[in-house]
From Swiss-Prot:
Classification of source organism: Bacteria, Bacillati, Bacillota, Bacilli, Bacillales
Any matching Pfam family: HD
DNA-binding region, residue intervals: 14-90
This protein's UniProt keywords: DNA-binding, Exonuclease, Hydrolase, Nuclease
Biological processes annotated in GO: rRNA 3'-end processing
Domain HD: 163-279
Entry protein name: 3'-5' exoribonuclease YhaM
E.C. no: 3.1.-.-
C-alpha cells in the first residue's frame, strides 16, 4: 500500500495522487505569478508552490481538483513542504471519488449522534432541552458533515461534531468536579456554540467562508438562530437570553471575536473547554506526524511553537 502524505519524511521522493484543498495566487519577487496550493489526502495536508504559472495553469489547479504530483519533501523554515517537480490533473479513469482524499473524524457519525442525543436527554430544564433539540434537528445533516474550521483545529470531515462530543465529555467531567455548574446550560452551550458554522462555512470539502460567514460570522448567526427557535417554540424565558450570551461570549474577548466577555459561570467554563479541546487537537495532530525525540513543525495557531515529542513516547 502506498504511503500517505503525512508519512513521508524530509528528503523522500513523492509520486502520488492528492486533492487540492486550496489554491492561492501570489506574486514573486521577480514579478511573476505563483500559486500556493494546499494538497491533501486522508492523513493530512501539505503546502506546495507552483512557480511561474500562466492564466491557463491557474485555471487548472483549483480547489477540489485531484492531481498527480511528483517531487520531494523539504523543511522550509520549520514547515514541511512538498517541492513540486511534476504535476498534472488526474484522469477520470485514475481516480474519481474526492471523498477518498479527505481526512475524517475518527468516530462514526452514528456513534456521535447517539452520544449527543444522550446528553440532550439528560437535560432537566425543558426550555433548554427543547431549544437545543430543535436547533440540532434543524441542522443535523450539516452538523455531522462539516469541519469545525477552515484551518488550525478539527478542520476535517465531521470535525464539528467530533469537537462537540469531546467538549461534552470535558463538560461532564468538570460538572462532576464542580456541582454548582448548571449542566443543562453547559451542555447546551457546548452543542450550540459552533453550530452557526454550518451557515458560516461552505461545506466539508475545500472549505471556505460563505457570504454570511464573511459578513456575519458563526457567533452572530447562532445568536439569531436561537432567537428564531425561541419564537417558533413560543419560549419566552430568561434561558433564551443566557444561551445567546453563552454563544456570544465563547471566544472570551473582543479581540478574539466575542462582543462580550463571559458573564455567567457556564459561559466562562465553555470558553476554557473550547480552547482546551482545540489546542489538544492541534498538538495531537502535529505530534502524530512526529517521531519520538524530534520536534513538530511549527504550529502557527499555538504561537508558532514547535512541540517536542519525548523519546520514550513510542
Amino acid at each position: 500500500m502506498k504511503k500517505k502524505i503525512a508519512e513521508y519524511e524530509v528528503g523522500e521522493q513523492v509520486d502520488v495522487f492528492l486533492l487540492i484543498k486550496t489554491a492561492t495566487k501570489g506574486i514573486a519577487s521577480n514579478g511573476k505569478p505563483f500559486l500556493t496550493v494546499i494538497l491533501q489526502d486522508p492523513s493530512g495536508d501539505i503546502e506546495a508552490k507552483l512557480w511561474d504559472v500562466s492564466p491557463e495553469v491557474e485555471k487548472q489547479y483549483v480547489a477540489e481538483t485531484i492531481v498527480k504530483v511528483a517531487g520531494d519533501i523539504l523543511n522550509y523554515k520549520g514547515r514541511i513542504q512538498l517541492r513540486v517537480k511534476q504535476i498534472r490533473v488526474a484522469n477520470e479513469n485514475e481516480v474519481t471519488d474526492i471523498s477518498d482524499f479527505v481526512e475524517k473524524a475518527p468516530v462514526k457519525k452514528e456513534d456521535m449522534v447517539e452520544k449527543i442525543t444522550q446528553y440532550i436527554f439528560e437535560m432537566r430544564n425543558p426550555n433548554i432541552q427543547r431549544l437545543t433539540r430543535h436547533l440540532l434537528n434543524k441542522h443535523q445533516n450539516e452538523f455531522l458533515d462539516y469541519p469545525a474550521a477552515t484551518k488550525n483545529h478539527h478542520e476535517f470531515v465531521s470535525g464539528l461534531a467530533y469537537h462537540v462530543v469531546s467538549m461534552l465529555d470535558l463538560a461532564k467531567a468538570i460538572s462532576n468536579l464542580y456541582p454548582s455548574l448548571d449542566k443543562d446550560l453547559l451542555y447546551a452551550g457546548v452543542i450550540l456554540h459552533d453550530l452557526g458554522k454550518v451557515i458560516e462555512l461552505s461545506g466539508p470539502i475545500s472549505t471556505t467562508y460563505t457570504l454570511e460567514g464573511n459578513l456575519l460570522g458563526h457567533i452572530s448567526i447562532m445568536v439569531n438562530e436561537i432567537g428564531k427557535a425561541a419564537d417558533e417554540l413560543q419560549i419566552d424565558a430568561e434561558e433564551v437570553l443566557i444561551l445567546q450570551h453563552i454563544v456570544l461570549s465563547h471566544h472570551g474577548k473582543a479581540e478574539w471575536g466575542s462582543p462580550k466577555p463571559p458573564l455567567v459561570k457556564e459561559a466562562e467554563i465553555l470558553h476554557y473547554i473550547d480552547n482546551l479541546d482545540a489546542k489538544m487537537n492541534m498538538m495531537d495532530r502535529a505530534l502524530g506526524r512526529t517521531k519520538p525525540g524530534e520536534y513538530t513543525e511549527r504550529v502557527f495557531a499555538l504561537d508558532n511553537r514547535s512541540f517536542y515529542k519525548p523519546s520514550f513516547h513510542n
